[in-house]
Amino acid sequence: MNPQLSPKAIREIREGTCNPLGAPQVTTDLSENIILTSLDDLHNWARLSSLWPLLYGTACCFIEFAALIGSRFDFDRFGLVPRSSPRQADLLIVAGTVTMKMAPALVRLYEQMPEPKYVIAMGACTITGGMFSADSTTAVRGVDKLIPVDLYLPGCPPRPEAIFDAVIKLRKKVGNESILERTKTEQTHRYITSDHEMNLVFSENTGEYLNKTSANSIPSSKKEKITELPDNNEKAEIIDTLEN
């Protein structure tokens, strides 16, 4: 090395040899306009800001949700856009009682929704069957027996403010998810509900139920066919016959 070079010149030569391109120079204006993020965060941010619900309202709970559409609550600020087709929705809001006849339709709508999809069970009737869970044979005692539920919203019915709180909690859940981890919707918890205790009812079209002995059945020997309206005496005889 040339001994006539100054120490500063020698230092510059060494830095140029080790790093010929030099350190990148980023201006202050450019550094303030750069956001570093991950693919998961970007994807979740886009999804939580544009939840498209499919409204499945069957009872009075849906009236409270309909109040959100007005200007007083304005659910558009959360990016909620109601859809009429399950193929365009990613959020299913079940509001009201689910009956046995409507259960297949609910499951079909859920299966037609694309992944990832979420479910909010709104109201006591949706979560446990509500007032119909005690003696009704047609009400489903908990919608989580049919489809997985992400968020339970109790109430009879829940207030619109409670619905907003449920949507905010769901947005937090969506924001913490990962694309690689969420491959399929899986329910991690269940609401404690009572099981169904139903007996098979024989077809009334064939009349087979008349041949089955039960506590409420009438013996065939005491059955009478009434073709015209009986008088008071005949009514008393028929009642005595049925009681005996």
Swiss-Prot record:
SUPFAM superfamilies to which the protein is assigned, alphabetical: HydA/Nqo6-like
Cofactors named for this entry: [4Fe-4S] cluster
GO terms for cellular component: plasma membrane-derived thylakoid membrane; respiratory chain complex I
GO molecular function terms listed in the Swiss-Prot or TrEMBL record: 4 iron, 4 sulfur cluster binding; iron ion binding; NADH dehydrogenase (ubiquinone) activity; quinone binding
Catalytic activity: a plastoquinone + NADH + (n+1) H(+)(in) = a plastoquinol + NAD(+) + n H(+)(out); a plastoquinone + NADPH + (n+1) H(+)(in) = a plastoquinol + NADP(+) + n H(+)(out)
PANTHER family, A to Z: NADH DEHYDROGENASE, NADH DEHYDROGENASE [UBIQUINONE] IRON-SULFUR PROTEIN 7, MITOCHONDRIAL
Function of the molecule: NDH-1 shuttles electrons from an unknown electron donor, via FMN and iron-sulfur (Fe-S) centers, to quinones in the respiratory and/or the photosynthetic chain. The immediate electron acceptor for the enzyme in this species is believed to be plastoquinone. Couples the redox reaction to proton translocation, and thus conserves the redox energy in a proton gradient. Cyanobacterial NDH-1 also plays a role in inorganic carbon-concentration.
Protein name according to UniProt: NAD(P)H-quinone oxidoreductase subunit K
Gene designation per UniProt: ndhK
